[in-house]
Amino acid sequence: MPLSVKGPVMGDIRVTLPDGSERILAEGATVRDLAASIGAGLAKAAIAGKIDGVQVDVTAPLTDGARVEIITDKSADGLDIIRHSTSHLMAQAVKQLFPTAKVTIGPAVETGFYYDFDVETPFSPEDLARIEERMRELAKADIPVERQVLSRDEAVKLFRDMGEEYKVEIIEALPEESVSLYRQGDFVDLCRGPHLPSTSFCRAFKLTSLAGAYWRGDEKNKMLQRVYGTAFADKKELDAYLEKIEEAKRRDHRKLGRELDLFSFSDDVGAGFVIWHPKGAMLRTLLEDFERREHLKRGYDIVVGPQILKTELWQRSGHYDNYRENMYFTEVEGQGFGIKPMNCLSHMMIYKSQLRSYRDLPLRFFELGTVHRHERAGVLHGLLRVRCFTQDDAHILCTPEQLDAEIKGVISFVNDVMGIFGFDYEMELSTRPEKSIGSDEDWERATGALLGALKDSGRPYEINEGDGAFYGPKIDIKLRDSLDRKWQCATIQCDFTLPERFDLTYVDADGERKRPVMVHRVILGSIERFIGVLIEHFAGNFPLWLSPVQAIVLTVTDNQQPYAAQVFETLRTNGVRVQKDFRNEKLGFKIREAQLQKIPYMLVIGDKEVESGTVTPRFRDGSNLAAMKPEEFVAFVNDEVKRFN
């Protein structure tokens, strides 16, 4: 439609584009018409739009005075729309191939999409290939996608007549009197949208895996068949993502944990409980020792609390009312106890054990505390989601005037630690929700301290309005690994609840009792989870200071065993974590095994090394260091490790 430069006439509408320019179109014009008025290329590329910030289909009519944005597959919002529409395409293919399948929900998620189906027989990998092939046929058919609005009663009748009882259940729970549906050929689905104009816009997709999922996430409900997939704007982006997925499979911490003999799980022990093998336990110990050193450097006091505490204490803290479904309980001599799911309460007791003065503050209590949480079996995942884990928990108790400096100190701590491990990270501030406790002054002070620390950090951050806990605002810190995946690790959480519930006080300069400000914080979070992330980040190739085994002594033949044994003892007694392989095997075989175990250095002992009293360190990538005395290698290792100790 042509642009009018003289202004609107009766029946025209005026809309504003993101750059501030205006367009005048005839009344009843749609998002697609607006795109066409700008250019034929944009009209062809348009997949959806935004009217006053609300996403709509390209067929949505424009309103006078609206601010309008055209969404293409290159837009920030475009990928989610592509993925959501591709989930509908998958559901259509499933219904054609498996007519008795019942459809449930199929949202876009961070890495793609999924759809849950109620099927008589779980899908096989061969079924997955058939579904994907049918999706390609439907995409090539260029089937228009059309939006339809029905009353709730009409929609219930439609889906009930189709035998789609899950959709009926969803609709009946909706508060709206009308609902929107999307049709593409013989398939119809309940959805708010928006969606692609036609199936031909689904150009690059792949079904990736099968899984089970309970309806509404409730184990009491029926197990459904979940199909995962992903979609992108073009094949190049899809191929790059699929290669990343293959690399992630090679780095899977569960796979490497077995291959490197770090840890295991056993049905005899129970799901979600890790058994640490010698090398895994050493890795964990190194990490925990690192944590203790770093905390002591920064003025934290190391404390240790018991594993079980009286049920009355959990009732007093509020955990019993709000968290007991995730707790384990036991009884001792008729007295109820709760196994701790977090470490806060012992720290409260330490604070209350004596009268505190403002001169004592800030107090920083740090504990590598093992906790137990009842996680559903369906969400357990290697080290990343377990039922027993250790957290690097700390609680800072300070005066209101000290809060700013304490928050900045924690962010500086996080920055230092993430730098040591080579992680980039993102920060998010979650602010006061509608339902909260604490005064306006408390919230303003705490939020201001968190926000000020974020600004002073010089790093980008996001604000999640209203997403804080009811008892205080927080900063969440998410690290990015070598595959650009995000992982939640550090948290800085202000808490107005526990100091009140436990009547924590200090005496100020005027002799009056005041309530301290409390900050919960973790740096690495769950040690188990962080180790899982480390394994995948480094692909098992841990840096020298963190490697459970730093070197292995290899003999070429049996003749070198006496000298090789001396080398081994020299390294071991001087603190190098060393193994030996004196087996009567070919050297190439032993080197290959050491490389598969990802040991940083191999010390090959042949006749030349015996004669010269040296070792020739070979790095795991195949490169060699110059020959050196065993004592020189010890010094080399210690110098490398000292940088992190």
Swiss-Prot record:
Cofactor(s), names only, from the UniProt record: Zn(2+)
Record organism: Geobacter sulfurreducens (strain ATCC 51573 / DSM 12127 / PCA)
Protein name: Threonine--tRNA ligase
Cofactor note: Binds 1 zinc ion per subunit.
Domain TGS: 9-72
Top-rank taxon: Bacteria
Similarity-based family: Belongs to the class-II aminoacyl-tRNA synthetase family.
Catalytic reaction list: tRNA(Thr) + L-threonine + ATP = L-threonyl-tRNA(Thr) + AMP + diphosphate + H(+)
Taxon lineage: Bacteria, Pseudomonadati, Thermodesulfobacteriota, Desulfuromonadia, Geobacterales
